[in-house]
Amino acid sequence: MEERELLLERLELALDRIREIPGEDWQEESLQHWKEYFTAVAKFLLLIEDTRQFLEQGKQNTATLEELKQRNHALYEDILPENYENSFANPAVAVKCLGEEFGALAAFLYTEMRSLIGFTYEGRLDELVIRMELFSEVYAAFVYEEQENHRLPSYASIREILYWFVSDYADVAAEARVRELVCPGNNFAADIIRRAELTDLRYLYAYGEYVGENELAMAKFLNSLPEETINTMADTYTEGYRIGFEVTGKDLSKKAAVDVRYQLGFERMMRRALENFDKMGLQPVIYRAAASILYNPSIYKNGFYSVSPNRQYEFDHKDDKALFLDKMYCSRKLEVMHTAFEKYKTEARGYAGPAVVETFGEKDFAPVNKPEAVKMTDEQSTLMVEHRAQMGQLQRQYIIEEERSFTIIAFPIPEVGDCFEELFRETIRIN
């Protein structure tokens, strides 16, 4: 049996169980909030499966703009600011409904399931399978204790399930992340940039990222600009990259891959930029900004991404790794990253560095430090500093800093206000 067939079989087994969850009764009245939680997450996972089928059947290409908007909204509506105060992804809500002991852990589990949106659009079936299986395993542990002993499972037993998930799949994730970083073979975003009909804004929904007014307005605005202006923007960006190598005496001809980072809506500029990089002998590596705990998500995004649908949601979960962070976890991460870089060491030497399109003009954000959100202990913070230093040292063994360069160019986003178009044109002139 082929790997894909095996994965589909495992997926269907997990889904069979997940489909039953909304209709199941819990005997203990005191545990009804847990039924609500598992039902909410199960319904989200069934929407993920519906989206997978939608994509497999090619409906992404035939659906109307309104249909694509509705699906995108359905996938993200639970964490939008107007709904977040009632969402189990919100640690404050999870703690209030599910208790102080389990609340943050439950919010983390749902957040990890939400990382499936991007994986679904990329067709990464293995990522779907392992998370659906994880959710099913956690649910089974709760149901067993509720039915047999009329109580919750121990916190330690559930944390252990989640701990072994992040540990067991650390090697797979490390290899995938290094491959994404240094091997130009992942063409998901590059294909959208190169092949999409950019005047048809339906293309924005092919990523699986949240599409809001910023992305739509940016794409529309870039579509309104003359070709000459787009060329100027892209050429300034790519020439800045090439000149970075030239002025520092680094040999660009030895390099094969450029790490392209941008926000959705800039595709018309990025198409010209990729053509320019092609002429330099560079193929793009373009990866999604991480959402899963296995890929080290951050409020500071690298890769391709959209304006956050809810920055408070991201802030609430920025330290979720503290649920697992210990010396053994750090050692495991370091070990699997070393193995992954060793596997792709030739490709790593061809990594030329990042070419970044940054944005400015987002509305001010004053994060709320919620007591219910996961926090690092002082010991964990120290451990994390050491771990990051070791990871950086490891990466520098394979991606030689003295042989790479970078470029950064910045543009305003529509959220900046009525002055957006004027400010954008002035930014082009200054660049």
Residues covered by each model-derived region:
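Active-site bordering "gate/hinge" segments
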Residues: 2-431
